[in-house]
Amino acid sequence: MALAFEVNTFAHAEEAGERVHAADSLHANMELADSAVTETRMQHIKKKVKHAGNVFYRFVKNFDNYDTTYISPNYYNFTAMLQNTNSFQTYKFQGKNEDGLRQTISTQPAPSVKVGPYFGWRWIFLGYTFDVAHPKAISKSTEFNFSLYSAMLGCDFIYIKNTGNFRLRRTTGFEGVGNKDFYNADFRGLNAKTVSFSAYYVFNHKHFSYPAAYNQSTVQRKSCGSMLLGMGYSKQEVNFDYTQLPSELLGTGNDERIVDELKFSKISYDYYFISTGYGYNWVFARNCLFGASFMPSVGIRKMSGEKLKGDELFNDLRNFSFDCTSRLGLVWNNAHWFAGASFISHLYLYRKQRFSLANSVNFCNVYVGFFFNRKKQYR
């Protein structure tokens, strides 16, 4: 009995061992299968990441992809430049009363004249400028202007805030007051802020170079133009205290001269737009270029706090607005040294039935500079 018992025990133990071995084998096979699946997934993810990276690289590469018979590339990595930037802004208010009397008030903040060095890498320029004309006005005005130009895409960002440092320029429609009677008179009844961002696409970017005219990173060799398409957003805030105007414009008692339409206190609105236009670079001599572009925009204007339904939005033309961005550039560039000037103007319009506001933001740049650190492929 003991022997039989021992034999049976051994047989059971052997059977149990086989089951354990089979279970271990199954577990090992499952681990191998999971490992294979994981490795396959990782390879798939790596392929996806590599493909996405290649697509992104080609997309970025196309920023400066052009026909070299029309456009000479930048042979250098870096740029040093000295620039003079002149900026000025104009606000024009116009009101018309029920009797048809039209009055306008034009005013400007103190213009800024800035000089400073810039350092560039490819399309990106960084620098610092000093206001040499009105250093005391710095505390009353904040200004930031950024533009990016590449062969295919470009963008503009503007932030300007002015608090009380305005001067009257022109007044019309006021009885007994000449157009220039209060020219350059202080006006502390206006605070204003402008924020704007826009981006655009250059259709004929292989032959037409925006950078050649406005950031000197390439040289246009043959005259050429291109259609432009963009979109953007802007916000305007204007706080207006008409009682700060000269008493001759306001009148007294029953002899009130200013129309009610100009007695507003605040305007604040958002503007969402699309824009289209055309740019042209004229090569009028070797290494010499004159560029011009014009981009009007149309979009929806929404007053702050205003809620509009779809039918109200599109049936009332007063909810639509029209703005414009214009550029001019004159450049001499021999691919190592360069000098030139550019003018950029942004016009923002606001209209109601008997009131309109025009805000014009303008920048004029004069510059001279050179390139250095030649790229490896051009050494």
Where are these regions (language model features)?
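Sec-dependent signal peptide cleavage junction
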Residues: 7-72, 376-379
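Outer-envelope beta-barrel architecture signal
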Residues: 74-80, 113, 122-124, 142, ...
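Membrane-embedded beta-strand positions of outer-membrane beta-barrel proteins
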Residues: 80-82, 117, 126-128, 155-157, ...
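Transmembrane beta-strands of outer-membrane beta-barrel pores
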Residues: 84-90, 121-125, 130-134, 150-152, ...
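Outer-membrane beta-barrel translocator/channel fold
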Residues: 85-89, 93-98, 104, 158-196
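Surface-exposed strand-loop-strand hairpins of Gram-negative outer-membrane beta-barrel proteins
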Residues: 88-114, 125-137
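Extracellular/periplasm-exposed beta-strand and loop segments of Gram-negative cell-envelope proteins
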Residues: 104-116, 168-172, 181-194, 238-271, ...
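Outer-membrane beta-barrel "beta-signal"
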Residues: 196-199, 360-379
